Amino acid sequence: MRIYVNEIKIKDDGIYCYSEDPTDGLVEVGQMLVDSDNYGFAYLLDDGQSYDYLIFVQETWSMLHENRGKKLIVNDDLVLEHFQEELDYILENVEGNNNYGKEFVSAVEETFDLK
């Protein structure tokens, strides 16, 4: 299932992400994928039987970048311990790599100040 982050609230203690879909019973896998066609980052979650994808669309990227280093919490109860290191890994791979598509790479580089 694709779970879209549709609201983000920044608080002193973290980045609080909200989705209309429930995240009860899900745990983080600690892996992120790129959806360059739809300009998104997909963070893998596991329910014990299958994977779900927590989707961060382009409109959320600037908030992730501006609040780098804060812990990330989904629907007030799912703390993503490995999110930042996975995002950093993805950003390193995307930077200058036109295999993801020039427009996608350009959008990532601009938003995350990679140029």
Swiss-Prot record:
Which superkingdom is the protein from?
Answer: Bacteria
Record's InterPro entries?
Answer: UPF0738
Family of this protein: Belongs to the UPF0738 family.
Name of the protein this chain belongs to: UPF0738 protein SH1953
